């Protein structure tokens, strides 16, 4: 059985794990609801992007050609509200926040998707889709004479199929707008308001306004992937009402739409969903202050199954750094032992990804609905066995376990090593290295100043912080040398 044929994914709509078979042999089409760029990213945003980046990478490792589309919602009530509160142009806010999201993705080695459409670039497609729904009797202009247009949920008997709800039992969380026929009807087109900027309104057959949130994703996904594609992904909090409404309007328009619906769990703080509205979130900037390298953040975000919620507390990155150091330690020990038998130790570290070197248990875990925690267990078992082999100087076993470890780390993109021209281990990216070096040098200088001022408690605290960054200090009479473990 090929590795491809062994892959299964959990479909949220059918509520079961199913064998994955793409619509087009050898190709995978994947649409993911990206961020609404109203403010800077937090841990939950990073996790969602990481999940689908890893999913895309695993499909590629299996030999598929992947088209990943992750949208950016750059027009929204909250964007307008936040821009007004900050006295800046809403388009400027959207651009600046989009840049912050991209910076966070880059630091976590999350690749740029095949396409990253802006909602505002697809207004014409949204209007065309709304007109189609009106023509089919599934949408109507508001009965109060405004430019609002609503999806008629009563016209679509399957409404509620994604979340297995009956319309009468739904807690409609769509905003209460005038002119609706039924409580669950949701906005496809929203009339502009006098207090909103003119640039946030577009001409339409129904009057000036802007698209509703749900219609945006239906238009962008079908524009870029067609009316029938393999997978639709997004956060668990988007299942209702966003994805429920998105599915209803797409199917009512006559589209087959997504074969699989995949939802990632949330990042919680003290058992509660991390969100900006609750003020209980940890920002991406805060995470990168704790881990400029970004590798421990990535490792931490992978420690729970993607469908499960992930708990955040102050010690999670320290735990992740310990695991990363365990990988580093084994690779260094193993390479030191086998280096004499290698033509080029640095070339060994730089070997291209080789799927055939992945242990069968690792492949089975990843093919089982992307079970990364089980895959990490296989990785750490290989490290344990490899360390034992190093202790026993079993060259062949060490070489085998080292090769497997490197390939597993590369598959998960938690590989802690690159090499310089001398074959010495260095940080994965020059950008991360420069940022980390700057932070370390500042902390070392602060510690020297604290010692000079006889503030030894402060000096010890800085030493602890440097230790958590994987830094070893060597004090001399007039200076401090440092190295990274």
Predicted regions mapped to residue ranges:
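N-terminal, positively charged nucleic-acid-binding surface of large information/translation enzymes
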Residues: 14-19, 23-111, 129, 482
């Amino acid at each position: 059985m090929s590795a491809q044929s062994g892959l299964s994914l959990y479909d949220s709509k059918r509520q079961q794990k199913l064998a994955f078979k793409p619509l087009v042999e050898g190709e995978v089409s994947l649409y993911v609801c990206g961020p609404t760029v109203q403010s800077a990213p937090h841990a939950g945003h990073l996790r969602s992007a990481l999940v689908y980046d890893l999913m895309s990478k695993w499909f590629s490792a299996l030999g598929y050609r992947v088209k990943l589309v992750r949208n950016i919602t750059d027009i929204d009530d909250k964007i307008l509200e936040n821009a007004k509160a900050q006295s800046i142009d809403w388009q400027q806010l959207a651009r600046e926040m989009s840049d912050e999201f991209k910076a966070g993705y880059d630091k976590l080695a999350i690749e740029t998707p095949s396409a990253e459409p802006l909602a505002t670039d697809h207004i014409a497609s949204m209007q065309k889709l709304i007109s189609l729904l009106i023509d089919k009797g599934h949408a109507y202009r508001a009965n109060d004479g405004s430019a609002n247009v609503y999806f008629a949920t009563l016209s679509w008997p399957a409404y509620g199929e994604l979340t297995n709800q009956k319309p009468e039992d739904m807690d409609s969380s769509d905003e209460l707008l005038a002119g609706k026929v039924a409580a669950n009807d949701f906005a496809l087109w929203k009339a502009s308001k006098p207090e909103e900027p003119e640039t946030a309104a577009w001409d339409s057959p129904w009057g000036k306004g802007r698209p509703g949130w749900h219609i945006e994703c239906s238009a962008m996904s079908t524009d870029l992937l067609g009316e029938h594609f393999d997978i639709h992904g997004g956060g668990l909090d988007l299942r209702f009402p966003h994805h429920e409404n998105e599915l209803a309007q797409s199917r009512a328009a006559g589209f087959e739409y997504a074969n699989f619906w995949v939802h990632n769990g949330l990042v919680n703080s003290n058992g509660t969903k991390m969100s900006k509205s609750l003020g209980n979130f940890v920002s991406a900037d805060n995470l990168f202050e704790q881990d400029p390298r970004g590798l421990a953040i990535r490792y931490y975000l992978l420690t729970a199954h993607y469908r499960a919620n992930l708990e955040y507390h102050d010690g999670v990155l320290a735990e992740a750094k310990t695991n990363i150091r365990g990988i580093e330690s084994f690779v260094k020990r193993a390479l030191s032992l086998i280096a004499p038998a290698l033509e080029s130790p640095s070339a060994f570290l730089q070997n291209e990804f080789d799927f055939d070197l992945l242990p069968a248990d690792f492949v089975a875990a990843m093919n089982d609905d992307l079970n990364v925690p089980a895959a990490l267990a296989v990785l750490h078992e290989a490290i344990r066995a490899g360390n034992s082999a190093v202790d026993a100087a079993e060259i062949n076993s060490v070489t085998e376990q080292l090769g497997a470890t490197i390939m597993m780390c590369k598959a998960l993109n938690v590989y802690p090593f690159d090499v310089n021209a001398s074959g010495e281990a260095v940080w994965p990216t020059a950008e991360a290295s420069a940022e980390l070096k700057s932070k370390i040098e500042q902390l070392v200088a602060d510690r020297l100043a604290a010692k000079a001022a006889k503030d030894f408690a402060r000096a010890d605290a800085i030493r602890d912080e440097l230790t958590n960054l994987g830094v070893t200090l060597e004090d001399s009479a007039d200076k401090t040398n440092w190295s990274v473990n």
